[in-house]
Structure formats: C-alpha cells, structure tokens
C-alpha cells in the first residue's frame, strides 16, 4: 500500500509540474487567444482520476481475472505428489524472498508458461501451466517459480499498473488538447465541441496509445531482466539459464495465455521488427546472455 501511495503522490507532483510548465510557456494564453477556454489543471486532474482508476481497478481484481481467464485451479489441498512438491517449492522460495506464501495454482495449457499476479507482494498468486509441469525437469520448474516469486518480491504487478496509470493520464490529457486545438483553431468551431473535436480526440488517443504502450512494454521488458536475476539468486544461475534455454526450444509453440496476462507470464511469445517494441518480454537469447554476463 505504501508503494501505491508514494507512486500516486509522485505522479500528482508530475501532473502539477506539467501544468505549471505549460502555463509558463504560455500554452494557456495561446489556446485562449484562439478561442479555446481550457483549464489545464482541471483537465489534468480529470484525466489522472480516470487514467489511474482503470489500472488500479485492474490491479485489485487481477487475481480473480487471472483465475477466470486462464482456468487456473488453486491447490488448497494437494492431491498428488507433484502438487505437494509444487506447494513446498513455492513456500520455500517465498520464505527465501521474504514474502508471504502466495496462492498456488495450475492452469490447463500445453505450452510451458507461468505467471504471477496480485495487488501486493503478500497477497499474490503464482500459477504454472500443465505443460510446464509435464515436460520440464524439477530444477527447471523451480527456476521458473523463482522467476515468478521474483516478480512478486519486486512488486512488479503494482509498479506496472501504476506506470500504466501514468501513461493513461497523459494520453487522455494530450488527446483532449489536440481535439480542442483541431476543433477550435483549425475548424474554427465556436459553439461547444464539434464533430472535429471527437474525431481528433479518438485518433490522437489511438496514436498516443500506441506510443504509450511502447513505453509500458519497455518497462515490462526491464522488469523481466530483474525477475531473471531474482530467479537466479533463488534457484541458481545455471538452473535459471537452463529453464530459459528450455523455453527457447519450445518457442515455436503458440502462446494461448490471454493478452491481459501475457505481460505476467515467463514466456511472452516472439515478435519481429517494429512489433518487437510492443513485446512484454525481451528475446530469450538476450535474457540468457544477461544471466551469463552476471555470472
């Protein structure tokens, strides 16, 4: 909770600085001179409320959504020795990472994958696919679990949601400024908000949204390196490299995890060219090389 409060306070400060900066550069005067009566401070607050609301709601219901969309079955009472081993391994890794034991589950998917989610590091969910349990060795599964525990210990779910809230705020803010500019300055509309405002705002939100997604995915790729490092500390560098190499062997298999969950899995799929800027995970080769350099 302290992380959320600190991050929100920081971003309110960013919003305030942005508003003051625009005023100092005479943006308010320029817009007013062209017939645009726009209170930038109020607009920023409005956008911040709605920008953060969506990402924070998603964060607080993330465990429920993950269970629903992936079909994850929570292990409350282990029925097999594999489930017993899974619970014991997660408990051991959680203790080493200094976090409370998360819920543990298995989701029905052939591809080898796993994810962690939850609104804070002491109320999380870690789940692995059936395919991962069936085809990976115990050491490889343990390394994958260590990677996911690393995400939880680092508070990555919270931070990613808050970063998303920040970019949502500025996408909404600048899209509405662009919409007002097009409507009032270019089309000279003097009565309320014309059709040009709505069209320009929608187009601007689409374009700025793509750019914002690149920023969020850049951050997501950075956190994967950090989770790999945490996994190496908990399970050993050799085991973490071995798990990533095994994932690389299976890279041709389609990833059936819902789009909303791919950023939280260990295997985010593969994209090429400009689409690579929208990847939630770095290429496995880069992750393996980073661990080798780490030693």
From Swiss-Prot:
Subcellular location: Cell inner membrane
Cited Pfam families: Peptidase_M48
Entry GO CC: plasma membrane
TM spans (from-to): 4-24, 41-61, 158-178, 199-219
Keyword terms of this UniProt record: Cell inner membrane, Cell membrane, Hydrolase, Membrane, Metal-binding, Metalloprotease, Protease, Transmembrane, Transmembrane helix, Zinc
EC number(s) on file: 3.4.24.-
Named cofactor requirement(s): Zn(2+)
Molecular-function GO term, any one: zinc ion binding
Similarity field: Belongs to the peptidase M48B family.
Protein name: Protease HtpX
Organism: Pseudomonas putida (strain ATCC 700007 / DSM 6899 / JCM 31910 / BCRC 17059 / LMG 24140 / F1)
